């Protein structure tokens, strides 16, 4: 008899049981026929014992089949038990290739789990998708500072920022409140720890403000999005721990809020101060300009530059900043951006402010984790 390949994978014992029933033989009778203990027959049928070459020959002689049939049944059954593991390896590799799994686990955004189904479900839930081939809805909408499509790592950061923002309590938003908030924020520009008050000021204005540490290679500065049509939210990464960068990025995102941008299409701002202006959309150029002007009056800055350039001494920078009631680091930052001084000059004024911000603003990262 030729070799038969079953359409479904069953243990050889299932076939042995069928053969015995077809012939009306008991396990005791069959054991006597092949000259083996009844225990061997019982264990093969129950799947506790594998079919060996010896038993395959005995079975084939008793049933008139080829020994290859029984060996093929055994080998296919054993392979079927291994295949799910191999499939899991492929699925796991696909998940790690598509999503920043390791970093998400490290940050506590999802839990580490050896069960591929649970890991997969966590990722699908996080990104709001139902299959690995589906793109997160937010990725089709998200606009970056550059025209390049947002990466999955950047989308992961944005998804987390949105989730964290939902936990940030705020008052009802209004444009009038935002204008008041901008004036109050400007009054804090002269203080090293002025950033500490940003969260409370924006909460009164109805703006959800959160900090989410960037993921490796993300290069995100901030984002503007709306939780609903009446709830604007901004998130900063604080990837540059400098007083000038914090205030510039904050005012940049608030300008998006003021213009109701990010309402239907979340805005991801990447390298907002370093990108080539030729690659930046008009709304980003405007937000950058507004942010710079909120910190220093263009007329005042141009007058200062005309008087002092190129001899920007420490005393002159400090005197100018005091007259405008802003921190010297903000002046240094704008002079560097205009390439009027090297980035190595006056760096002592570019003070760190991260600890002040994260002490009062809902923060995910930098040693803090927001519970879901």
Predicted features along the sequence, with ranges:
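Active-site hotspot residues in diverse enzymes, especially metal/ion-binding acidic/histidine motifs
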Residues: 2-372
